[in-house]
């Protein structure tokens, strides 16, 4: 199984990395093309495009102007350790063993508006460019048109290398939309996580994001290859519900109300 997760808006470039191993992103020529567009934007245009504050607009204008190859441990950080959102709290990559990080390096991928597809230990410079951003570019009017089937083709390489038949989608809709499903050579498993609130099971964003990260870790720790093994996920009180799972490849995990 190959797993994909979303990136995070929050970044941590202050905590020293838990490993000195690193690799380079594989789609940097595409990133460079996007950067040429981004560097032309004024802070005001960035704010309007991304719907962010003046302060954040200025920060990201500076990031765009400072972004430069080559990536080193002095000016970049491993992606899985740099992203700092809810998914990454659940994944908790800094506590993975060296062997688990090696396994993650070949079985986990991070979708990215700027980098396309990242390996966990790929060095990454700070940026903000969400996949849903309507950034006009040489290939179209947004990032979905820019990436086209590039991400799916790269995933196919990973799937083939690991002889994997499943792609586990633990990403958000915004990001997974960037994967050209028709070009993908795999069955897609999309787990759903629902928490009980006021007697009803529903998707609660914060909990669901963290659960995606926890499942990504579970798949790494247990080297899961089959759907039946994935359904055995019972971390943090979640459990597979056959009754709630309407589609075979969309397993639903429930968690009862927290006391």
Swiss-Prot record:
**InterPro entries, from UniProt?**
YaaA
The identity of this protein, by name, is UPF0246 protein PSHAa2558
Q: Which GO terms describe its biological process?
A: response to hydroperoxide
The family line of this record is: Belongs to the UPF0246 family.
Task: Fetch the Pfam families from UniProt.
Answer: H2O2_YaaD
* Single GO cellular component term: cytosol
Q: Where are the transmembrane segments?
A: none
- Top-level taxon: Bacteria
Organism, scientific name: Pseudoalteromonas translucida (strain TAC 125)
